[in-house]
Structures are given as structure tokens and as C-alpha cells.
Regions:
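Residue-level signature of transmembrane alpha-helical cores of multipass secondary-active transporters
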Residues: 45, 49, 98, 141-146, ...
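Interfacial segments of alpha-helical transmembrane regions
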Residues: 130-151
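N-terminal, membrane-interfacial amphipathic/helix-forming hydrophobic leader that caps
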Residues: 1-128, 276-310
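Transmembrane helix-loop-helix hairpins at the membrane interface
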Residues: 6-12, 26-29, 150-156, 161-310
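Juxtamembrane loop-transmembrane helix junctions in multi-pass integral membrane proteins
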Residues: 89, 93, 132, 176-179, ...
Length: 310
């Protein structure tokens, strides 16, 4: 029976922000935060961006190199690099492993972001990005944002078609080379990629830039950075890259207007969800159409593995 000075608790349901002290439970207090006035600067934000790129380039190697050794490749051979590269772009299992490696890459990137933003738990994480619904609309804002994400996807498809979307992208070649890769990419696009990408670009990078150089310059810079990093995935298709640029500028403007990151994540997630559904059901639709031979794998297909994020 708790005394008048005690707050009853239940095993497994303790609040991680509550600190027990002499029979009392004291709520852990974080300093006040402003999403438009972060504690980090432009230099730190760009270092985090570079670190996220390096993580996404290195982690896949930890999967493909052991697989190459398992397949009998000799690491002391002068042709090991060439043979491993050939294996990576021709073997369906190797391709699947590289795509699968994006999940721990996302987890590690989120851990890096948490350490950077919170100073290892000294500051709140989500609140630092402006995480919340509109005070006037509440959760109804979510439904509107989902609709906007779906609408943006439709506009993006029309834009890509208008500018030429008939050229197969490197990402499409990668997806068509492995059934397992198709499903993993679809799942990552919905459940992890929107968080990682928004936290990095419109969370860490934009918030520091808008304070240093102003909103307009920050929007343009993030637009360029976001579009540039998708070039390896979607080249040489200018239409698809234009659709990516459209998504980026809308998301960044919404972040600038609302001062909150949650709307960007919801829109990004719904945009990706439409693409993921189409990705999953595409093979079944293709069975009803005349068969066309898939493009031959090339070394350039490895470039999208640096950034399997829609």
C-alpha cells in the first residue's frame, strides 16, 4: 500500500524519464528546446550528414566480404576486389545481403543521430526536431498529411512521365535482380527510411542552416543535397529525379512553415507507402503483360546500395 508520498508503479511499465529518489519519483526535466534554434551548428550538422553517408557505404561491405570468402574467393589474390564486385552484382544472395544490410545501417544512423542531438541523453530527442501535431487540428492533421503524401506521389508520377520516365533506373535494375531485395526495400522505404532521412535532412541539417543563412537559402541547400544523394539510385532518369526534387522542396517548405518535423515524416512515409505497395505487386501485374528480358546487372548497380532510401 503506497504512502501519500509515493506514486504507485507497475513492473515493466515504469516511465524512463522518472528517477526514483528516497521513496519518491521525480520526473526527469530536460532543458527547453526550440526546433528552429538547435544546440548544434552547421559544421556539426554537415559532419553528421557525412557520417551517415560513410556508415551506409561501409556497413554493406561487412556483409558482402564475408559472403565472398564463404564462396571461396581468396582475399590475398590480386583479383579479389574484381571478383567480389562481380559476385556482388550477379549473385542474387549477395544482392539480397547488401540490401538487408541497410537495416543495421539505419539503426546505427539513428543511434548516431540520438547521440548527437541529445548529447547522450542530456537533451530530448524528438522534441528537438519539433515533434507534435497541430494544436488546432490535432491528430486530424495526420489524415490530411497522408492524403498530401499520396497526392504528391501522383503529381510526381505525372511529372516523371512528362519529363521522361521510360529509362530504367539503377534502383529498378537492382530490385528486379532479387525477389528478396524487392520486399526488403519496400519494407525499409516505409518503416525506417522516412525517419532516418527526415531526421538527417530536415531535422539536423535544415534546422542549423535556417538559423545561419536564413530560411530561403536553407530550403534551396537541403533541396540540392537531398536530390543529389538520390542521383545514384535514379540516374539516368531525369523524370524520376524531378519527382524526388518535388518531394524534397514540399517537405522542406512544410518544415519551414510549421516549425515541426512530424508532418514531414508522415508525408514522406505515405509517399513511400504508395511506392512500396506498387513495388510489391508489380511482379504479379507483370505476369499479365508481355515478358521483357531484365537488364543485365552492372557494377553501377552497387551505387544505390549507398542510399537505399526513397
Amino acid at each position: 500500500m503506497p504512502t501519500s508520498n509515493e506514486v504507485p508503479t507497475f513492473p515493466g511499465l515504469e516511465d524512463p524519464n522518472v528517477i526514483p529518489h528516497d521513496g519518491l519519483q521525480i520526473k526527469k526535466q530536460f532543458p527547453a528546446v526550440d526546433a528552429n534554434n538547435p544546440v548544434w551548428g552547421v559544421g556539426g550538422a554537415l559532419l553528421v550528414w557525412i557520417a551517415s553517408i560513410l556508415v551506409q557505404a561501409i556497413i554493406p561491405l561487412l556483409f558482402i566480404v564475408p559472403f565472398a570468402l564463404h564462396r571461396g574467393l581468396n582475399p590475398s589474390s590480386p583479383d579479389f576486389g574484381r571478383a567480389a564486385l562481380e559476385l556482388a552484382v550477379t549473385d542474387p544472395t549477395a544482392i539480397f545481403l547488401q540490401v538487408l544490410s541497410i537495416l543495421p545501417t539505419h539503426i546505427l544512423t539513428l543511434a548516431l543521430l540520438w547521440a548527437f542531438v541529445t548529447r547522450f541523453g542530456k537533451r530530448p530527442f524528438l522534441a528537438s526536431f519539433g515533434w507534435g501535431w497541430s494544436r488546432s487540428l490535432g491528430v486530424f492533421e495526420g489524415a490530411a498529411l497522408v492524403g498530401l503524401g499520396v497526392l504528391l506521389f501522383g503529381v510526381g508520377v505525372m511529372l516523371a512521365t512528362l519529363l521522361g520516365a521510360d529509362k530504367p533506373t539503377k534502383l529498378e535494375q537492382l530490385i528486379n535482380s532479387s525477389t528478396g531485395a524487392r520486399y526488403v526495400i519496400a519494407a525499409l522505404a516505409v518503416f525506417t527510411a522516412p525517419f532516418v532521412e527526415e531526421f538527417v535532412y530536415r531535422g539536423v541539417v535544415y534546422s542549423a542552416l535556417q538559423r545561419a543563412v536564413g530560411v530561403k537559402a536553407a530550403v534551396v541547400f537541403v533541396l540540392g543535397l537531398f536530390t543529389l544523394i538520390h542521383v545514384p539510385q535514379y540516374s539516368p532518369n531525369i523524370g524520376v529525379l524531378s519527382a524526388v526534387a518535388l518531394l524534397s522542396i514540399v517537405l522542406t517548405i512544410i518544415r519551414a512553415y510549421t516549425g515541426r518535423l512530424l508532418p514531414c515524416v508522415v508525408i514522406h512515409m505515405s509517399f513511400n507507402a504508395v511506392q512500396a505497395v506498387l513495388l510489391v505487386f508489380e511482379p504479379y501485374v507483370q505476369r499479365l503483360l508481355p515478358a521483357t528480358p531484365p537488364p543485365a546487372p552492372t557494377a553501377s548497380m552497387l551505387l544505390p546500395l549507398i542510399r537505399i532510401i526513397f
